[in-house]
């Protein structure tokens, strides 16, 4: 582009004919011009001679004759045409390069329009129909969801990279899935089965869920409901050598348990076996009505629900006691005891018995030394009440003239007054 602008300058046109044709041919080869008219114009410039720098002063009558210059008007027209065409061509080149640069910069820098984590963009992307979702589909970096590229939602370089990684992982997963399916199919061909990787995964998941459910139900059963009486009943059956109808053989289990507790079983009636049996409450009511098959070991030929005859007891000492209970026994004389004398003495009033000496007596009676000290002490003066003490008569009111005639009292010292007052008080207390 720069060399073409130099060609059209008047200094360049004033060169020699051979040098001008060589340089023009080189530029024509280097520039890929879409129009053939431009080549013809440039080749026709080599025919003209430029003797002076101002595009030639002479006038050319015949264009085919040598030694004459063309008219400046035609030369100016040719130069204007070349410059105008090159300007259009340069504008197209600049426009294309600017578009390419802008698109390249858009792919390099991050787009902050649709991938900033805003909820409205995500909702529009997910609520839009599939017919609108045209173009690339990328995974949002913030929400890890697929977002389609619509107007206002640009895809940056980071999203393109994530999309490519997602495609690569998907392809790897497909390849691995094929390998797994071939392995499973080869393994299952021996057993006559054919499973895909998806079915195998579902089967393993179902097994895991089944195991979890079993463990959960096992943990839900309380320890009181984990068959605590079954072992006891089996032990009772082992003693009786009977194991056929264990949970429903009422009287047998009750008898065994009561023998363990040291009690004699009651007569085996139907009502009694249902109400008093401790294990019958835990057996279902349907089991009580169904008769059980007899066993050889027990030698029981009748149904357990039918009342059995009472077995005769062996003769014992209690038989004589039962016969004696009907005859009233004579009162047996009691042996003489100390209580008989006590009953006779109860009618006579007893003298008051002296109390035994205790520690409190010493506290109540002071020792001799304290008694003697109390005797030696002089008796304390008796305190008189306010009513018993003779009240001194109130002084009579005297007139001023009589009061002035009386002699004035002598002034006494404070110490004498205090001693005199104390002696008078003690005299009143001692000699009332």
UniProtKB/Swiss-Prot annotation:
Residues 270-280 have a biased composition (Polar residues). Transmembrane segments: none annotated. It comes from the Eukaryota. Residues 374-402 have a biased composition (Basic and acidic residues). Residues 260-280, 353-420 are annotated as: Disordered. Residues 408-420 have a biased composition (Basic residues). Disulfide bonds: none annotated. It holds the Pfam family NPIP. PANTHER family: NUCLEAR PORE COMPLEX INTERACTING PROTEIN, NUCLEAR PORE COMPLEX-INTERACTING PROTEIN FAMILY MEMBER B15-RELATED. Belongs to the NPIP family. This is Nuclear pore complex-interacting protein family member B8. The lineage of its organism: Eukaryota, Metazoa, Chordata, Craniata, Vertebrata.
């Amino acid at each position: 582009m720069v060399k073409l602008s130099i060609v059209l300058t008047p200094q360049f046109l004033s060169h020699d004919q051979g040098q001008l044709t060589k340089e023009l041919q080189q530029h024509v080869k280097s520039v890929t011009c879409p129009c053939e008219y431009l080549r013809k114009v440039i080749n026709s410039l080599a025919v003209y001679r430029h003797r002076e720098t101002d595009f030639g002063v002479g006038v050319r009558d015949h264009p085919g004759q040598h030694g004459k210059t063309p008219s400046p008007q035609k030369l100016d027209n040719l130069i204007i045409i070349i410059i105008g065409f090159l300007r259009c061509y340069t504008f197209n080149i600049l426009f294309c390069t600017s578009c390419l640069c802008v698109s390249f910069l858009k792919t390099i820098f991050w787009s902050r329009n649709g991938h900033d984590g805003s909820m409205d963009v995500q909702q529009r992307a997910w609520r839009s129909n599939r017919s609108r979702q045209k173009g690339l589909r990328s995974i949002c970096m913030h929400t890890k969801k697929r977002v389609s590229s619509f107007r206002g939602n640009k895809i940056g370089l980071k999203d393109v990279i994530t999309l490519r990684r997602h495609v690569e992982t998907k392809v790897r997963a497909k390849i691995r899935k094929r390998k797994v399916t071939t392995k499973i199919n080869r393994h299952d061909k021996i057993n006559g089965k054919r499973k895909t990787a998806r079915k195998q995964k579902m089967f393993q998941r179902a097994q895991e869920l089944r195991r979890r459910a079993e463990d959960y139900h096992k943990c839900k059963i309380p320890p009181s409901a984990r068959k605590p009486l079954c072992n006891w009943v089996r032990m009772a059956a082992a003693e009786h050598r009977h194991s056929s109808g264990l949970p429903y053989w009422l009287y047998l289990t009750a008898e065994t348990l009561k023998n363990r507790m040291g009690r004699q079983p009651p007569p085996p009636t139907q009502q009694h076996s249902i109400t008093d049996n401790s294990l019958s409450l835990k057996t279902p009511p349907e089991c009580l009505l169904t008769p059980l098959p007899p066993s050889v070991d027990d030698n029981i030929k009748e149904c357990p629900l039918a009342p059995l005859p009472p077995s005769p007891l062996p003769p014992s000492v209690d038989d004589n006691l039962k016969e004696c209970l009907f005859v009233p026994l004579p009162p047996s004389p009691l042996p003489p005891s100390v209580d008989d004398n006590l009953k006779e003495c109860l009618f006579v009033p007893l003298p008051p018995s002296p109390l035994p000496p205790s520690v409190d007596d010493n506290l109540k009676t002071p020792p001799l030394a304290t008694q003697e000290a109390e005797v030696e002490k002089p008796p304390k003066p008796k305190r008189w009440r306010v009513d018993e003490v003779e009240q001194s008569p109130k002084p009579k009111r005297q007139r001023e003239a009589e009061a002035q005639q009386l002699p004035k009292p002598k002034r006494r010292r404070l110490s004498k007054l205090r001693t005199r007052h104390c002696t008078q008080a003690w005299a009143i207390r001692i000699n009332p």
